[in-house]
A protein has these predicted regions:
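Active-site-adjacent helix/loop patches that line small-molecule binding or acyl-intermediate pockets
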Residues: 1, 13, 22-24, 30-54, ...
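Alpha-helical structural signal
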Residues: 11-14, 100
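Surface-exposed beta-strand edges and their flanking turn/coil or helix-capping segments
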Residues: 21-23, 31, 71, 75, ...
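A short glycine/serine-rich beta->alpha loop
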Residues: 60-65, 152-156
Length: 207
């Protein structure tokens, strides 16, 4: 079919929630805000709890929907199960596989053309998903250490530093995406002069 170009806006941020609600044959009602006790949000919470092994904290994110607070270790556990659905509780194995394969078939629908998510999923056996304020999650389907789940957070929330760190981390784990825009990207001042660059120096410690 014909591709449609559009600029994602506020109305697109809750599309997956509405689609899930309709898939369950429930009437769609208009709500000014997404609420944590809505059936879809309760299902999201239960799913994340089952996959992370922890009870997440709750807040409201930039899209005005309930969001969850987890330690990086627990988030990485959930991404590991996305990488290796056969290790997940039985009820989640097929859904995880479907989500994983859908994201890998259509990586440009995850974060848009030109994003680090899209590039990594096009080039490597990974599922990649960025989040707000320097957050990143990775499911490595294969590699020198087998399937892995990774959760990363840049403490000050810097977006560009996150991308640089993710690419460097994948290389350190034996998955090289090749040349990317996030290899030593320049830092420029207000006049546009290059005054430095960003570089990730990693020291991995396995626990």
């Amino acid at each position: 079919g014909q591709a449609h170009q559009f600029d994602p806006g506020l109305a697109h941020r809750g599309v997956a929630f509405v689609q899930d609600h309709r898939h369950r044959h429930q009437p769609v009602q208009r709500h000014a805000d997404a609420v944590a006790d809505h059936p879809v949000q309760r299902l999201n919470l239960a799913t994340l709890e089952a996959l992370s092994g922890a009870r997440p904290g709750l807040a409201t994110d930039g899209c005005s929907v309930p969001t969850f607070a987890l330690s990086l270790a627990r988030a990485a556990r959930a991404f590991f199960l996305l990488a290796d659905p056969g290790r997940a509780p039985e009820a989640y194995r097929t859904p995880l596989l479907r989500v994983r394969e859908a994201m890998r078939r259509h990586p440009d629908l995850v974060a848009g053309p030109g994003s680090v998510d899209t590039l990594l999923m096009e080039r490597l056996p990974v599922v990649a998903k960025r989040g707000a304020d320097g957050y990143y999650g990775l499911a490595l389907l294969e590699g020198p250490r087998g399937p892995l789940g990774v959760a990363l957070k840049v403490e000050d929330g810097a977006t560009l530093a996150r991308e640089v760190a993710v690419v460097a981390l994948l290389r350190a784990l034996g998955l090289d995406p090749g040349k990317t825009p996030w290899d030593r990207p320049p830092v420029r001042n207000h006049r546009g002069l290059e005054v430095g660059h960003l570089e990730a120096r990693l020291g991995l410690v396995w626990v």
